Swiss-Prot record:
GO molecular function, one term: GTP cyclohydrolase I activity
Keyword line: Hydrolase
Protein name (record): GTP cyclohydrolase FolE2 1
GO biological process, one term: tetrahydrofolate biosynthetic process
Pfam families per the UniProt record, alphabetical: GCHY-1
Function: Converts GTP to 7,8-dihydroneopterin triphosphate.
Family designation: Belongs to the GTP cyclohydrolase IV family.
InterPro entries: GTP_cyclohydrolase_FolE2, GTP_cyclohydrolase_FolE2/MptA
EC annotation from Swiss-Prot or TrEMBL: 3.5.4.16
């Protein structure tokens, strides 16, 4: 039944809790919301993000204010930037009277690419994630994660074969804790430039010839991929801490090859 606006409704979650157990993380997850972002060229791009938002809860408080997480998203105006995401974290902690929290949003991100020979354009989708972590009495950290599909070609197969070499699609996951803003495009390009070849949404026959020969001239083991990308990440001043992983979906096996490498920049 509908309740009159002036009726008293007890706020049960705001009551005291006698168990004296702090909760490190409580909130909402699987919350899908439309999102606008600025791409590397400053143009607006639209997507749908899946949010996970949480705060720490003191031991004496029974529950957090779940509705305020959604209110936080409703209060947004304009495209979300990396700096704006840090502001959202500060607003969330203020709204929920918390000293620690986490915002994670995962979304498909589309980049328009041009085929290497014909020049035809097409969109390619990437999985992207932005994470803001705030611990009590510490500065908030911003992490960017992307999954870039690429082509890898086996150096051993090329060396021992009279013609051809086995190749496959690989997924390279790059995760970077940022010192300053860095575009998704910039992180993706590092992966694509260090792969045997990048992949495209649309290729004509001259383009297919080009990418086939590009991969053949640039063979790399899964170990080569993560090492070459790591060298690029180590020399990126916008990155404080990084991790790179590659999964090669082997075309001659029913399993994947995998490698992971991580480190910190001085």
């Amino acid at each position: 039944m509908n309740a009159p606006e002036n009726i008293f409704l007890p706020d049960v979650q705001a009551a005291a809790d006698t168990r004296r157990l702090a909760i490190q993380s409580v909130g909402v997850k699987g919350l899908r919301y439309p999102l606008q972002l600025e791409n590397a060229a400053g143009e607006l791009t639209s997507t749908v993000a899946t949010f996970a938002m949480s705060v720490g809860l003191p031991p004496e408080v029974k529950g957090t204010h779940m509705s305020r997480f959604v209110e936080l998203l409703e209060a947004r105006t304009g495209p979300l930037t990396q700096v704006g995401l840090l502001r959202m974290m500060a607003d969330m902690l203020l709204r929920l009277d918390a000293s620690s929290g986490r915002i994670e949003l995962a979304f498909p991100y589309f980049i328009r690419k041009m085929a290497p020979v014909s020049g035809v354009e097409s969109l390619l989708d990437y999985d992207a994630t932005l994470i803001v972590d705030q611990r009590a009495w510490e500065s908030a950290t911003l992490t960017l994660r992307v999954v870039a599909p690429v082509t890898s070609l086996c150096p051993c197969s090329k060396k021992i074969s009279d013609y051809g070499a086995h190749n496959q699609r690989s997924h390279i996951t790059l995760e970077a804790r940022l010192r300053s803003p860095m575009s998704i495009e910039d992180l993706v390009r590092i992966a694509e430039e260090e792969a045997s070849c990048e992949v495209f949404g649309l290729l004509k026959r001259p383009d297919e010839k080009w990418v086939t020969e590009r991969a053949y001239d640039n063979p790399k083991f899964v170990e080569d991929l993560v090492r070459d990308i790591a060298l690029r990440l180590m020399n990126e001043p916008r990155i404080a801490e990084w991790k790179v992983a590659s999964e090669n979906f082997e075309s001659i096996h029913n399993h994947s090859a995998y490698a992971e490498l991580y480190g910190c920049n001085e």
